[in-house]
């Protein structure tokens, strides 16, 4: 794959509904709940470390959860991968690498608009439509929002691609616009 050093990509991440709540011990990019004070705005700028393991945020999120928690199975993850490839291909975008796990999705997207949140909305919306058709009904499957981290230059883009490639527990992935099923571990 050829990457021009003045190019950019988006490392886009979103989660399945209820599976990775604010306050999660693994890490999270969400507002942090401080009892008696309200919320501290999420930190989602390049170079900002992730926040992790905050019990008050986790407990508050569980209280506010309105639908069942969603965990993708291998077939659903592969459908998501195929939908991301189709959405990107239709728009002339490239997904260099994506990883679909039971509880979240990472995608490195190139040749796309500078508006990361818009790119994420397109990908999530297309994946939702495919899952809705698969389930035969509407079901709240994604958390609102997500993370859009812009990567500029070859080194940053290749680092993001490697980060996504190294994800554990992948059910499906995309390797240079090819959806692939992952072997069960």
Q: Where on the chain are the PLM-derived regions?
A:
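Short catalytic/metal-binding and nucleic-acid-binding patches
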Residues: 1-185
